[in-house]
């Protein structure tokens, strides 16, 4: 089959989803399909076709893209709409199947495909569910005129896709409740960078970050409103007299400066803020931690799941999900991977979970869970099969 792979990032710059997308392309090529990529030119200096894909039958069109200010919701939406319009002339009429990367303009993207390729198999990937995610962040109100319009555009995209791939049972429930046909929604967990859990990781590259004589509590990733890193600051406040515990916030984002200021106002001494690290260091950071914390604001588990989750599981260190006890994914990780789950807005519960792990209460089954549910070859292969079926 000829597969059109429509991305809403560019390979010219590192992104959290690049290893997911490149793995799917690799599986498609290994299965004998040819792949043409439409992607953004974001001005980065990385190869537009990653080295590991260069040996396959992969071609690409690169579309100039001017990013909007991350804090300007409307400008960002319009920038994405402009990107879709600029891509239309590159959508040829000879593709058998189309994969569309997760984006906030599903209806516009799918309609552009259907206009050119009415008989193609269309698969839409949902990594987060817009506009419900921005409702939870407080950007817009549910059932407002804006929400209804934006939600209607997304529903159109899901309705006119043949397959919808999402990344958790919680998110599937949200899609189905929002009128997506249950039979077209497939759950495939995101994966890490390899099939096997990480063993004997060389921690030297982050030796300057972590303190050997402390219990290191780690958050690494984007620092925005949705990530709810606030709960870690509040937990650190409650534990600022714990002389054997050190908190590490690793990453950048629009909310970081506010959190640094709050930590200073609280007089928290046992906390460090570090800049975002290269993606290849993610397994090293998570392996060096004594516990990794994965937080989200209240109810966001219904619309998103942090992409780092699989890599954290692969590193086989204790994990605390501060996402809410009602999460199906959280409950599954608690039962099958031995992870802890606490509410998003209860820092006292996070403190209690940290103390339990500090005191040796661990149930280390994360590696087994990772092998069972998060293998890169199997899960990217499942995605490739759906795209071409």
Label each residue range with its predicted role:
Residues 80-84, 97-119, 123-133, 342:
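An aromatic- and histidine-rich active-site surface loop
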Residues 8, 12, 65-73, 120-152, ...:
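Acceptor-binding helix/loop patch of EC 2.4 sugar-transfer enzymes
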Residues 41, 170, 188-191:
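Carbohydrate-associated surface elements
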Residues 248-250, 257-281:
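Nucleotide-activated donor-binding/catalytic signature segment of Leloir-type glycosyltransferases, i.e.
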Residues 227, 278-285, 292-313, 319-331:
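Nucleotide-sugar-dependent
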Residues 203-204, 345-352, 358-387:
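A charged, aromatic-enriched C-terminal amphipathic alpha-helix characteristic of glycosyltransferases
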Residues 85-88, 108, 112-116, 144-166:
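Membrane-proximal helix-turn-helix segments that form the acceptor-binding/catalytic region
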Residues 1-56, 241:
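N-terminal subdomain of nucleotide-sugar transferases
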